[in-house]
């Protein structure tokens, strides 16, 4: 039996395992991949990427994994284009993410 657990994020999008998402932290945001969903707590485990340059993201040498409340996920279905040699890729919608983060920040931070 396969159990699909999902939650809705800030925009109302459903969040699933393996989704690439943007997460609000303090006065900035980070891009990462949902690794695990803790259905009983509205929390997800996310493996974060590092910002390399102008919209490019890659996986850090040392894994950066954290458990995050779904309320901090403000953008889901982030599309990574053209994965590089270290994985990751270019975030095609970086301007949209930044704009929505500003709105999120004004509403919640």
For each feature predicted by the language model, list its residue ranges.
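Short beta-strand-centered aromatic/proline hotspots
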Residues: 28-38
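Mixed-charge, Lys/Arg-rich low-complexity intrinsically disordered regions
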Residues: 1-17
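Long, low-complexity acidic tracts
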Residues: 1, 40-42
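Epigenetic mark-reader domains in eukaryotic nuclear proteins
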Residues: 43-109
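Intrinsic-disorder/low-complexity loop/linker signature
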Residues: 12, 27, 54-55
